[in-house]
From Swiss-Prot:
Tree of life domain: Bacteria
Compartments it resides in: Cell membrane
Protein name: Uncharacterized protein aq_2087
Lineage of the species this protein comes from: Bacteria, Pseudomonadati, Aquificota, Aquificia, Aquificales
Membrane topology: Multi-pass membrane protein
Main localization, broad class: membrane
Keywords assigned: Cell membrane, Membrane, Transmembrane, Transmembrane helix
One CC-aspect GO term: plasma membrane
InterPro entries in the cross-refs: P_starv_induced_PsiE-like
Species of the source: Aquifex aeolicus (strain VF5)
Transmembrane segments: 26-48, 72-91, 104-121, 125-147
Length: 183
């Protein structure tokens, strides 16, 4: 029973949260250079593909080789945009210690648009592919709009005048939470 009291004490919980925060900061310190290196490598790949494309163009390469180089360049540029969106999500996780739904949806939209561009560009699509991607894009877009609308409503609600009753309820809830943490 003494162990249970110790691990549920306020001091122990604060210590554990502090250890967790230090661990997350350590991981962030390790991950940020890796993220930067990944972006630099992606940029280098794009420049290499661009050089390859220009080389094929200037030396009058076979149309098939020229087409492959161009498709590879487009694919890697679109991959770079997806990487940027995913890195924005990761940086937000490090900065705010939470995943923002809005940014996940933005990354999903960028990924779906990338896939649509690639299948249309490579002429390997069917009616059902486009219908499926269209439905997915519509769902992601509606979710994004609804999230934005609900956030605006939340802001309006937060900045309104608080009644005396609401203020006293908030104060009593704060006191109740403090009491629970002390136990």
């Amino acid at each position: 029973m003494k162990l249970l009291e110790k691990i549920t004490s306020y001091e122990f919980i604060c210590k554990m949260v502090d250890i967790y925060n230090k661990f997350v900061n350590f991981v962030a310190i390790l991950m940020i250079p890796i993220l930067m290196l990944t972006l630099l490598i992606a940029i280098a790949i794009i420049f290499y593909d661009l050089r390859l494309f220009v080389d094929y163009f200037l030396h009058g390469a076979v149309a098939e080789e020229y087409d492959k180089a161009f498709k590879l360049l487009v694919r890697n540029i679109l991959n770079f945009f997806v990487l940027i969106e995913l890195f924005k999500v990761f940086i937000d996780v490090l900065e705010f210690r939470r995943i923002r739904k809005r940014q996940i949806i933005e990354a999903g939209i960028v990924f779906v648009v990338r896939e649509i561009i690639l299948i249309v560009f490579e002429h390997r699509f069917t009616f059902w592919d486009l219908l499926g991607f269209g439905a997915l894009l519509l769902a992601l877009g509606l979710t994004y709009v609804l999230l934005e609308k609900s956030y605006m409503e939340y802001l309006k609600f937060e900045h309104r005048e608080i009644t005396k009753r609401e203020r006293s309820e908030r104060e009593s809830l704060k006191e109740q939470r403090k009491g629970e943490l002390k136990r």
